[in-house]
Design a protein with these regions (language model features):
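Amphipathic, charged alpha-helical segments and their helix-to-coil junctions
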Residues: 11-160
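Bacterial Sec-dependent N-terminal signal peptides
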Residues: 1-14
Length: 160
């Protein structure tokens, strides 16, 4: 009982805060620019992928028509078939490279945004005198008592 009393007195002085980082990030100008840059890259990569797919389809149809007419000598047919296989492999490789490039672009664009957010969280936490700031967007917390935990998402200091 005596041990519980000091803990109870100490617990009353603790301040906790919470934010929703996703709400904060989506209104940052840096986020809008990053999203636009990523969408532009995606459009370019998609256009190139579509162009190579159309080129492959055209050559494949020409090959099929030549085979159907039986107008190709065997060695030319083999060479064209090999060209088609090479085109398919290059296209698959390009698709994999494009996915990796998109993931890297996303990470590169978002890293400074998350750093800025984390720095702002630290500054707001220090200014508000809270012990912890929980991010409800990154870590689901089943219950938040709004009277005991300060919602810092729309912090008046506008550090976010």
């Amino acid at each position: 009982m005596l041990l519980a009393l000091p803990m109870g007195v100490f617990a009353q002085n603790l301040k906790f805060g919470h934010i929703n980082a996703q709400e904060i990030i989506t209104v940052m100008p840096e986020f809008t620019k990053a999203q636009n840059d990523i969408q532009n890259l995606e459009k370019q990569l998609t256009a190139e992928l579509q162009r190579t797919q159309e080129e492959f389809n055209k050559k494949y149809q020409e090959f099929q028509q030549a085979i159907a007419k039986d107008s190709l000598p065997a060695n030319i047919a083999e060479r064209r078939q090999k060209e088609l296989q090479d085109m398919m492999q290059r296209q698959e490789q390009f698709q994999q490279d494009a996915q990796q490039q998109m993931a890297k672009a996303q990470n590169d664009a978002m890293a400074p945004i998350y750093k800025k957010l984390d720095d702002a969280i630290k500054a707001v936490g220090a200014a508000e005198g809270v012990i912890y700031i929980f991010d409800l967007a990154r870590t689901p917390i089943p219950y938040v008592n709004e009277t005991l935990s300060i919602n810092l998402t729309n912090n008046k200091s506008k550090k976010f």
